[in-house]
């Protein structure tokens, strides 16, 4: 299956994305990760005001197949969570790159975004993982 990833997104090895929106960064999980999980039944996210540290676990997504930890692609202060994903996980399932975003962070160091993969590099990674 071929996936489309927005050009302005940056991706972590663990399949989370970060999208710069002004001074804030929107974080979610990629369509590839959602596809691998299957039907999502529960999403666990931290509280507004919490601090995320790049590479550390900040929540989880539970599907009928597995529970997967979510890892922060960048460090920063959590300023908003997507409440609708908590109450209706199918929003994450149906539109992971749009209405299914997870949180918004005020980045501690916006330069950390440059350490993440661009969409083309991530698409290549996904193609390799899909063929294994």
Curated annotation (Swiss-Prot):
Keywords: Lipoyl. SUPFAM superfamilies: Single hybrid motif. The keyword Transport does not apply. Residues 24-106 form the Lipoyl-binding domain. The glycine cleavage system is composed of four proteins: P, T, L and H. This is Glycine cleavage system H protein. Belongs to the GcvH family. The keyword Nucleotide-binding does not apply. It holds the Pfam family GCV_H. Binds 1 lipoyl cofactor covalently. The modification N6-lipoyllysine is found at residue 65. GO terms for biological process: glycine decarboxylation via glycine cleavage system. The glycine cleavage system catalyzes the degradation of glycine. The H protein shuttles the methylamine group of glycine from the P protein to the T protein. Its cofactor is (R)-lipoate. It comes from the Bacteria.
């Amino acid at each position: 299956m071929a996936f489309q990833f927005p050009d302005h997104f940056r991706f972590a090895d663990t399949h989370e994305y970060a999208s710069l929106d002004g001074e804030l960064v929107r974080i979610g999980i990629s369509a590839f990760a959602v596809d691998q999980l299957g039907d999502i039944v529960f999403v666990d996210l931290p509280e507004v005001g919490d601090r995320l540290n790049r590479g550390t676990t900040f929540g989880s997504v539970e599907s009928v197949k597995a529970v997967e930890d979510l890892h922060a692609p960048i460090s920063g202060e959590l300023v908003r969570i997507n409440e609708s994903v908590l109450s209706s996980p199918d929003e994450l399932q149906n539109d992971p790159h749009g209405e299914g975003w997870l949180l918004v962070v005020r980045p501690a160091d916006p330069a950390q975004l440059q350490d993440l993969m661009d969409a083309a590099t991530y698409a290549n990674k996904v193609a390799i993982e899909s063929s294994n």
